Design a protein with these regions (language model features):
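Noncatalytic regulatory segments and standalone regulatory/sensor domains
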Residues: 114-132
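Active-site nucleophile-adjacent alpha helix/oxyanion-hole segment immediately C-terminal to the catalytic cysteine
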Residues: 1-59, 64-74
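Conserved active-site-adjacent core of cysteine acyl-enzyme catalytic domains
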Residues: 53-103, 109-111, 115-118
Length: 132
């Protein structure tokens, strides 16, 4: 079972004539992950992350800012009992999560992971935030 689903709410996302998405390398994974988790627009999420970044004196996509944002929005930081890939985590977790990988964030929601490509499914997670 493939538990990946394409997701890119960025207003500048482009598609080929056949409807398939073009490659995406914008560095906005933090914004996209939280967009999906909170059912918000890319712009609203980016503005909120920037506001938190002003408080933390850090950039919107940096770990200190994303952690402060997640906690401010009611998420709870959790530890993994063992090493898990994003795909394995998604298969066993129903609910809403923002997963922290090495230099990447991805949203897992109701047993699927949402990103601009399925390449991160085999990556190991470091920690995650759960929306409670």
């Amino acid at each position: 079972m493939n538990n990946y689903e394409y997701y890119n709410p960025n207003p500048t996302a482009k598609f080929k004539k056949d409807g398939t998405p073009m490659k995406w390398h914008k560095g906005d994974c933090t914004v996209r992950a939280f967009c999906k988790a909170f059912n918000q627009t890319w712009t609203k999420t980016y503005e909120e992350l920037c506001a938190v970044g002003l408080k933390t004196f850090d950039m919107p996509g940096y770990p200190k800012t994303s952690e402060a944002y997640a906690l401010e929005k009611g998420m709870v930081k959790k530890s993994l009992p063992k090493y898990m890939t994003v795909s394995d985590f998604a298969k066993t977790h129903n609910g809403t999560y923002v997963c922290v990988l090495r230099q990447h964030l991805v949203c897992v929601k109701d047993n699927k992971y949402y990103d601009t490509g399925d390449w991160c499914g085999d990556w190991m997670m470091k920690t995650y935030y759960e929306l409670v």
